[in-house]
């Protein structure tokens, strides 16, 4: 593994530890060059409450390409809708060691605009 990926994984582990200690549900973001994934994990960290990605048919049909900011915005809106339907208004944002820039920022901004607080 290259050093850049190792450093990202280390950052993600540190963040995840702090989030788990808070006991709040968390919105975890993961990305690849072609797709972006978002999951809401319970406060104990042992159960996935909701998940959505650009692999979902609704998202893939709504966007032209799944590896851009437009698709990340759509994923952010849809994960916020799922969270609200579960009664979750406030959660912790886990960017999984990725920089808060580009697609990660677009997903977070769309989720905030749809009513989530983190």
UniProtKB/Swiss-Prot annotation:
Does the keyword RNA-binding feature in the UniProt annotation? yes
Any one GO biological process: translation
State the protein's name.
Answer: Large ribosomal subunit protein uL18
Identify the keywords attached in UniProt to this record, alphabetized. Answer: Ribonucleoprotein, Ribosomal protein, RNA-binding, rRNA-binding
Q: Which SUPFAM superfamilies match?
A: Translational machinery components
Q: What does this protein do?
A: This is one of the proteins that bind and probably mediate the attachment of the 5S RNA into the large ribosomal subunit, where it forms part of the central protuberance.
Whom does it interact with, and what assembly results?
Answer: Part of the 50S ribosomal subunit; part of the 5S rRNA/L5/L18/L25 subcomplex. Contacts the 5S and 23S rRNAs.
S-adenosyl-L-methionine as UniProt keyword: no
User: What NCBIfam families does the annotation carry?
Assistant: L18_bact
Q: Which Gene3D superfamilies match?
A: 3.30.420.100
- Report the source organism: Dichelobacter nodosus (strain VCS1703A)
**Record-level GO cellular component terms:** cytosolic large ribosomal subunit
Q: Which Pfam families match?
A: Ribosomal_L18p
Family (UniProt): Belongs to the universal ribosomal protein uL18 family.
């Amino acid at each position: 593994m290259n050093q850049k990926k190792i450093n990202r994984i280390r950052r993600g582990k540190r963040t995840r530890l702090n989030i788990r200690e808070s006991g709040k549900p968390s919105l975890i973001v993961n990305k690849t060059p072609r797709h972006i994934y978002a999951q809401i994990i319970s406060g104990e960290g042992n159960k996935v409450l909701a998940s959505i990605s650009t692999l979902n048919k609704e998202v893939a049909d709504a966007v032209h390409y799944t590896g851009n900011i437009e698709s990340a915005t759509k994923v952010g809106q849809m994960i916020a809708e799922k969270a609200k339907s579960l009664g979750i208004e406030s959660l912790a944002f886990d960017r999984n060691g990725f920089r808060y820039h580009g697609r990660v920022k677009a997903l977070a901004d769309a989720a905030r605009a749809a009513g989530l607080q983190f």
